[in-house]
């Protein structure tokens, strides 16, 4: 199963809009080895059970049934995290709340894609 990198954002957030090009570049670079999802938490608040985010954008990285990372990071740090998820060197550092959110994100993506989430 490919790792999943979900960017949790909000349409009104200027930082999220600026981050979108960086996220697209990650997808172009790592897309064959990792799944990427851009998720507006306000549009998907019901499916995500209204997650309590401290900062935008927030990355959620998971592999299999493990939540590897959950938090806000700079683009440079995000690239290191994505590379670590892809090569298997990223050690899990996210808690139970991130694991629950990862499950909700996967279900949302399955609904969007008709069962195609990683």
Regions of interest found by a model, annotated:
Residues 8, 27, 31-47, 53-55:
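Thiol-based oxidoreductase modules, predominantly thioredoxin-like and allied folds used
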Residues 14, 43, 76:
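Short alpha-helical
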Residues 17-21, 25, 50-51, 68, ...:
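Chalcogenol-based redox active-site neighborhoods
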Residues 55-100:
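Non-catalytic, surface beta->alpha helical segment in thiol-disulfide oxidoreductase systems
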Residues 91-118:
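Acidic/histidine-enriched, glycine/proline-rich intrinsically disordered or flexible terminal extensions
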């Amino acid at each position: 199963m490919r790792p999943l990198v979900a960017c949790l954002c909000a349409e009104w957030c200027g930082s999220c809009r600026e981050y979108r090009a960086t996220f697209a570049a990650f997808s172009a670079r790592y897309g064959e080895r990792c799944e990427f999802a851009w998720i507006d938490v306000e549009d998907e608040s019901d499916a995500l059970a209204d997650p309590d985010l401290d900062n935008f954008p927030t990355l959620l990285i998971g592999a299999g049934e493990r939540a590897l990372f959950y938090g806000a990071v700079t683009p440079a740090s995000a690239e290191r995290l994505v590379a670590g998820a892809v090569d298997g060197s990223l050690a899990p550092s996210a808690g139970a709340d991130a694991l629950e959110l990862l499950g909700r994100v996967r279900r949302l993506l399955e609904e969007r894609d008709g069962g195609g989430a990683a």
